[in-house]
Curated annotation (Swiss-Prot):
Pathway as given in its UniProt record: Amino-acid biosynthesis; L-proline biosynthesis; L-glutamate 5-semialdehyde from L-glutamate: step 1/2
Enzyme Commission code(s) on record: 2.7.2.11
GO cellular component, one term: cytosol
SMART domains (alphabetical): PUA (SM00359)
Keywords: Amino-acid biosynthesis, ATP-binding, Cytoplasm, Kinase, Nucleotide-binding, Proline biosynthesis, Transferase
Name listed for the protein in its UniProt record: Glutamate 5-kinase
Gene3D superfamilies for this protein: Acetylglutamate kinase-like (3.40.1160.10), PUA domain (2.30.130.10)
Localisation per UniProt entry: Cytoplasm
C-alpha cells in the first residue's frame, strides 16, 4: 500500500478509566498501533483528548468538573500527565512524541496556519509523532473547536490526510444510541452524512467524553468536505490501525473506501466545490497539465481573476479562453498575481503551505483534453 497520511483521534473514554484518571494500558495499546503504522511507512498525526479526564482526579475533583475554570485547571494537570505517558510509551518503539496545543484562532491567522503546517511537516520528516490537543487551559469558550472531533477534521483537511480515524468506545455509528436503545442497528459504510443522521445521533455515552456521536458526525461531514474519508470505531492490539486502513476495522466507514480516497477528492473538485476564480495559463503549462500529467507551476500562469483564497477551487483556462480543468490552489489570488510567471523557488514563499505548485496534480481535474493549444 502506498504511504498514507493518517490522522488518528482518540477520545477521552479510550484513554482514561470510566471515573477519570489515565489508563496506561489503553494508552499503550494505541501507541503500539500507531508505532506499527509508522513502521509500515505511514505518516501518523495523533489528536488526543483526555487532558481534563486525566487531570481532574489528581487535582482533587471527585468527578469531571463542570465549571470552565475547573476544566481548564484539570486540563493543565492532565495534559502533562498525558504527554509524559505518550513520550515514554513511544520511546519504547524508538519514536519521539511532540506536543502541539492549538486554539481556534490558530486556524484564523494565515501566519500561524503556515507555521503549524511547517512544524508538523518537519516533525513528520524527522520521524516524530505530532500529538495535538486543544489548548484547553487558555481557550475561551466561544472560540473553542467545539471538541476534538472537529479539531481532528480540520487538521486532517489542512494536512491533506488520506484518512481520519476517530477511535472511540463504541464500534461505529448506529441508527440510535445503542447504550439506550438495544435495537439500534450499526452502519458499516456510509457514502455521506445527512442531516437526518445528525439529528438521530445521540450525545455523550460516557462520563468523560464530550460531544458524543453527533459531534463525530459533524466532524466527519467536515472531513468529507475536505476530501478526507473517515472511520469511526474501535479496536485493540498492534494491528488495529493497519486493519482499519485496510478496510477491516470494527466500525463505520464514511466516504469513499480509504484507498480510493483520491478519486473522491477529485469528484469534489469537479462537481461540488464552489468555483472561486479563474487562472489563465500559457500553452506550455496547458500541455504539461493535459498531456504530461504535471502540476501547474507559477511560471505558466499568465492571468488571475477573482478574489479566491488559498485552497479554493478555481477554473483554469488556456490562451484561447477555453476551460481546460479545475483545481484547488495553493495561492490566494492576490499572491498569485504577484508571482505569476515567476520561478517556483521564488514564488513558494507566498504559498501558505510553502508549496511551489499553483495546483498540485493531486488537486487537479481535467475537464477538456481535446482543446490543447497548438
Ligand atoms: N447513534 C449512535 N451510535 C453510536 N454511538 C452513539 C450514538 N449516539 C450516541 N452515542 C454515544 O456516543 C458515545 C461516543 O461519544 P463520546 O463519549 O463523546 O466519545 P469520545 O470520548 O471517544 O469522543 C458512545 O459511547 C455512545 O454511547
Ligand atoms: N481537549 C479535551 C477533550 C475534548 C473532547 O473533545 O473530548 P472527547 O469527546 O473525549 O474527544 C481534553 O483533552 O480533555
Amino acid at each position: 500500500m502506498k504511504r498514507q497520511r493518517v490522522v488518528v483521534k482518540i477520545g477521552s473514554s479510550s484513554l482514561t478509566d470510566p471515573k477519570g484518571g489515565l489508563c496506561h494500558d489503553k494508552l499503550f495499546d494505541h501507541v503500539e498501533a500507531i508505532a506499527y503504522l509508522k513502521q509500515l511507512g505511514h505518516d501518523v498525526i495523533l489528536i488526543t483528548s483526555g487532558a481534563v479526564a486525566a487531570g481532574f482526579g489528581p487535582l482533587g475533583y471527585p468527578a469531571r468538573p463542570t465549571t470552565i475554570a475547573g476544566k481548564q485547571a484539570a486540563a493543565a494537570v492532565g495534559q502533562s500527565l498525558l504527554m509524559q505517558a505518550y513520550s515514554s510509551a513511544f520511546a519504547q518503539f524508538g519514536f519521539t512524541a511532540a506536543q502541539l496545543l492549538l486554539t481556534r484562532s490558530d486556524f484564523y491567522s494565515r501566519e500561524r496556519f503556515r507555521n503549524l503546517f511547517a512544524t508538523i511537516t518537519t516533525l513528520l520528516e524527522n520521524g516524530a509523532v505530532p500529538i495535538i490537543n486543544e489548548n484547553d487551559s487558555v481557550s475561551i469558550e466561544e472560540l473553542t473547536f467545539g471538541d476534538n472531533d472537529m479539531l481532528s477534521a480540520l487538521v486532517a483537511g489542512f494536512l491533506h490526510a488520506d484518512a481520519l480515524i476517530l477511535l472511540t468506545d463504541i464500534n461505529g455509528l448506529y441508527d440510535a444510541n445503542p447504550k439506550t436503545n438495544p435495537q439500534a442497528k450499526k452502519y458499516a459504510f456510509l457514502p455521506e452524512i445527512t442531516d437526518e443522521m445528525i439529528e438521530a445521533a445521540g450525545g455523550i455515552g460516557s462520563a468523560v467524553g464530550t460531544g458524543g456521536m453527533r459531534s463525530k458526525l459533524l466532524a466527519a461531514r467536515k472531513a468529507l468536505s475536505f476530501g478526507v474519508s473517515v472511520f469511526i470505531g474501535t479496536g485493540s492490539g498492534r494491528e488495529k490501525l493497519a486493519d482499519i486502513l485496510a478496510g477491516k476495522g470494527d466500525g463505520t466507514y464514511i466516504g469513499v473506501p480509504f484507498p480510493k480516497q483520491m478519486q473522491m477528492r477529485k469528484q469534489w473538485i469537479a462537481y461540488h466545490a464552489p468555483v472561486a476564480g479563474m487562472i489563465t495559463v500559457d500553452s506550455g503549462a496547458e500541455e504539461a497539465l493535459l498531456m504530461r500529467g504535471k502540476s501547474l507551476l507559477p511560471a505558466g500562469v499568465t492571468a488571475v481573476s477573482g478574489d479566491f483564497h488559498a485552497m479554493d477551487v478555481v477554473d483554469v483556462v488556456n490562451e484561447k479562453g477555453i476551460t481546460i480543468g479545475r483545481g484547488q490552489v495553493y495561492y490566494a489570488a492576490a499572491d498569485l498575481k504577484k508571482v505569476k510567471g515567476r520561478p517556483s523557488e521564488e514564488a513558494r514563499q507566498y504559498s501558505y503551505l510553502h508549496r511551489p505548485e499553483v495546483i498540485h496534480r493531486d488537486n487537479w481535474v481535467t475537464l477538456r483534453k481535446e482543446s490543447v493549444s497548438k
